[in-house]
């Protein structure tokens, strides 16, 4: 999806002033927002790619001006409403209540040991996205490939700065959930995944550092084989 969410390769945004002692969480609510991801995942709100797509539904100005974990809250709300698991009017009513009564106790709820176990597993071990497929990969290490110029309207992992650029396959990872379908509610549809090396001069032109490269993970439909013999003729 094109938008402010795809800022890779963009300049002119100023320096990144990162404090030397920056904490993992800057506020208590951010800890809750972090823990909510595996919990909402388990509850059927969304998958990982849908999680990202929900963030892409934010107003661009709000996205740029808000803290990182607020993006997470926004996608929980988006998918909670979409799936019928959150009633927006009730959410707004409860939010207003706690704004007016910040010291009021939170609603009681039943502890679910299996959910806590799942959250711990997801946080410390991750949620694997690799899948088995019965078709061989189209590309191998050393192949010269070109990244598609397609401009998707839904969720995808096709950064604008690599579209139309030529690179070299350096690794095949097996098959993984395909974000272009999974992120748009169309199923996992796993595709082979590759790491492709793009030189800085291929990406940025003659002014690019001749000793630098970017390694970009590409799903199979993103790339096509370049006929190097024909190109050299």
UniProtKB/Swiss-Prot annotation:
InterPro entries on file: CN_hydtase_beta-like_N, CN_hydtase_beta_C, CN_hydtase_beta_dom_C, Elect_transpt_acc-like_dom_sf, Nitrile_hydratase_bsu
Keywords on record: Lyase
SUPFAM superfamilies xrefs: Electron transport accessory proteins (SSF50090)
GO BP, sorted A to Z: nitrile catabolic process
Record keyword Lyase present: yes
Keyword Lyase: yes
Annotated catalysed reactions: an aliphatic primary amide = an aliphatic nitrile + H2O
Biotech use, per record: Industrial production of acrylamide is now being developed using some of these enzymes.
EC number: 4.2.1.84
Temperature profile: Optimum temperature is 60 degrees Celsius.
GO molecular function: nitrile hydratase activity; transition metal ion binding
Pfam families in alphabetical order: NHase_beta_C, NHase_beta_N
Subunit structure: Heterotetramer of two alpha and two beta chains.
Function: NHase catalyzes the hydration of various nitrile compounds to the corresponding amides.
Similarity annotation: Belongs to the nitrile hydratase subunit beta family.
The protein's name in its UniProt record: Cobalt-containing nitrile hydratase subunit beta
Species this chain originates from: Pseudonocardia thermophila
């Amino acid at each position: 999806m094109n938008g402010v969410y795809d800022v890779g390769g963009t300049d002119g945004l100023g320096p990144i002033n990162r404090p030397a002692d920056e904490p993992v969480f800057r506020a208590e609510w951010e800890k809750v927002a972090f823990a909510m991801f595996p919990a909402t995942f388990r509850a059927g709100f969304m998958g990982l790619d849908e999680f990202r797509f929900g963030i892409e539904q934010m107003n661009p100005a709000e996205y740029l001006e808000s803290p990182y974990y607020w993006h997470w809250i926004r996608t929980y709300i988006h998918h909670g409403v979409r799936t019928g698991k959150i009633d927006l009017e009730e959410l707004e009513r409860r939010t207003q209540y706690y704004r007016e009564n910040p010291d009021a106790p939170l609603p009681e709820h039943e502890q679910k040991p299996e959910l806590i176990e799942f959250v711990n597993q997801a946080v410390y071990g991750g949620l694997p996205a690799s899948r088995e497929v019965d078709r061989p990969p189209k590309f191998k290490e050393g192949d010269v490939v070109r990244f598609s110029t397609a401009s998707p309207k839904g969720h995808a992992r096709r950064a604008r700065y690599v579209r139309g650029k030529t690179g070299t396959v350096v690794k095949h990872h097996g098959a993984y959930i395909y974000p272009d379908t999974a992120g748009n509610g169309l199923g996992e549809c796993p595709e082979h995944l590759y790491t492709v090396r793009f030189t800085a001069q291929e990406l940025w032109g003659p002014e690019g550092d001749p000793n630098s490269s970017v390694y970009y993970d590409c799903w199979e439909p993103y790339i096509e084989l370049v006929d190097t013999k024909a190109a050299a003729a």
